[in-house]
Curated annotation (Swiss-Prot):
Disulfide partners: none
Protein name (Swiss-Prot/TrEMBL): Myrosinase-binding protein 2
Domain of life: Eukaryota
UniProt gene name: F-ATMBP
GO molecular function: carbohydrate binding; thioglucosidase binding
Amino acid sequence: MSEKVGAMGGNKGGAFDDGVFDGVKKVIVGKDFNNVTYIKVEYEKDGKFEIREHGTNRGQLKEFSVDYPNEYITAVGGSYDTVFGYGSALIKSLLFKTSYGRTSPILGHTTLLGNPAGKEFMLESKYGGKLLGFHGRSGEALDAIGPHFFAVNSSLKHFKPQGGNGGSAWDDGAFDGVRKVLVGRNGKFVSYVRFEYAKGERMVPHAHGKRQEAPQEFVVDYPNEHITSVEGTIDGYLSSLKFTTSKGRTSPVFGNVVGSKFVFEETSFKLVGFCGRSGEAIDALGAHFAPLPAPTPAPAPAPAPAPAPAPSPAPASAPVPAPAPTPAPAPAPPNKVEALGGNGGTIFDDGAFDHVRKVYIGQGDSGVAYVKFEYRKDGKRETREHGKMTVLGTEEFEVESDDYITSIEVSVDNVFGFKSEIVTSLVFKTFKGITSQPFGMETEKKLELKDGKGGKLVGFHGKASDVLYALGAYFAPTTNSTTPSTPSTSKKLQARGGNGGASWDDGVFDGVRKILVGQGNDGVAFVTFEYNKGSQAILGDRHGKQTLLGTETFELDYPSEYITSVEGYYDKIFGVEAEVVTSLTFKTNKRTSQPFGMTAGEHFELNEDGYKIVGFHGKAGDLVHQIGVHAVPIFTNYRCVF
């Protein structure tokens, strides 16, 4: 449901109404010496981007982009005034406010003091609702403009934000459900929240506040499970949060239970969205609940079949039917191996996954202060963080897709200032015989974390607070004693480019649906890939950093179209130590994309005859330094006609 706010400006030009989309990613505004002449809007609807343009494209262009979908526009402002010789008002300037508390530069004309020129206006939803579309009037210029904002549907149960009036208002809207919640703290307050919503087969993230300490997360088994209750406390700011689900599970308490308590809960409803206020912390939090769908009626029982005539006696020589085959035994559950270390801190338990792809280790003054684990589950990437990150940063250990961790050497010690032993160092060993460097300070007391059966490490548990006190693990039986249980048909082609940035690896999927390439001043600033796994579209992480220069998209006609080759260039640029990728071009079984970026430097091509590309890996920092691919054989079905 949406709220159409009246347009501001003049009454000439032709009326337009873009309607309602899922969100706005980018706005480009053009101006001449008098007024705003042109607006171009990039909308998103069901995972696809659509462009709408109004006015006449002339004069100087300026762009404003949001960190979509995490960030969204919550207010549309600007100014309008009568233009000499035109006989009516025109839009003189535009500006936008977002859910991150940001305000765009003034796009258009300003006074000598830097304010919008003309009569100012600000259009926003009552509760910080998301901008979903524009309407207005235009011709040779932009005569008038108004927004469509998200509005609470009457069928929803809306809980107004509880807390203070600081920060900026935001409203994520209503989705199909909630997949995951991440909560970060800064001292005794909740400073950051990130919600991963479900919309059809897609995951839509929205983040609010300022990330300080490493966030903790609560994962919902969507669509089989939903959140039924949100409980928290307010002590000036949001101080704690707790969630209860339809399966009777209750999350840990995120934060400190101090201040006044609130509960969002409605019988036969489920949580589908959040709203609130935030700046440096979460000032207030509200929620949207939707009614549960009516249960599907049980089918009417089929009529009983007529009794069959009695069979004639079988001849004595009739063969005895073979016994039914014995069903294959269910896979053995993972083995939970006890945590090694001290007794301090708070218990955490990530559970078991399909694979551990990467481990990040952060050092403190006395030992391991922080760990982050990157898991794979049903083709999806999930992360868990524990401890507290320090200014000393993190190091990482990456596990190849056809390898797995078999054991960990854990060094522990009694350190002054801590009531029990803490973990001071970690060393990882894999099935392929790889041994990592020691992460931290090794001590005389070294313990080995393994299950004694050659199992594959698939999850972690332990104890942590400001440091890592203890670490344990889940080990799953391997399906083959000599070969890791990963697809043997995929090939990982070496990444090309410079040696800067941090390594990343999206892994192997069924195919690629869409590619987003962000431009920088001198090279490719970031890449994001949308993959397909089974019946789901999975949006990968952003690798690199978004800039104001915008994003270009290459969308495939999946599943009939697939990528066969990636070409590009990398080069040394001023001010960056390692070479960066300057251009990318994608070839499919049907066509070739435009070059994204500048074709300058060393040329490379990533392909394998008879293979298609189903995943990407590489290195990135503020720019993309390297890119490589995962490829699998192309299987074609043939039909013989006689």
